[in-house]
Amino acid sequence: MGFVVIQQPGDGRQNCGGIVGQIRLAKPTISLNVGEQNGAVLFADVQGYGRLRESDLPNYAAEILRPVARLLDDHETHVLTRNSWGDAIFAVFDDVAVAAECAMAIQQTIGSVNRDVLGYPFDLGVRLAGHYGPIRPIFDPIQGRQTYVGTQIVQAARIEPVTEPGMIYVTEAFAAALALIRGAPFACDYLGEVDTAKSHGRLPLYALRAAIAGD
């Protein structure tokens, strides 16, 4: 059975996981300009980072950033670029299913770190946002390496601030790209149109999760 986005009768919600009813999302048709390629973009924001003391930062790097780096290392053949600054983690993938897998792994990894291990008097959380669309590679002279830019990167960045802590919000394009992958173990629950950050507009968004029996 394939992985599709479906309309749930009665409650107006949609999810991914079976061929039922009318498929709302058709195969995405994305026009590429010269020099562009399709990619999946993830932004993550670590909740509680602003409460850390200077003396907490080495432990944060060891217990939060290092495990996330290892997750990305495990998928390095599909990771086009990655970066972090403060509470933010950014990664671009050439495969939307790998991006979804990494998003859920990051969610699980950060969410499961015990405050006793960190030595903090509070738990850290994470919110993640994903988008799929045309991105443009450029060489960044400041970083000294290739990175990716474009309006689609900005769109993903504007979704992350409105994501509920502990959740992964993705765009319709991300959900549709996943829907084309046969047997992909993911589900996307339709959230409705959501106001994005910095007056970027309203977008139909989905909550990404692992598929369960009955989806």
Predicted regions and their residues:
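Short amphipathic alpha-helical segments
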Residues: 16, 20-21, 156-157
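Catalytic NTP-binding/metal-coordinating core of nucleotidyl cyclase/transferase enzymes
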Residues: 23-102, 109
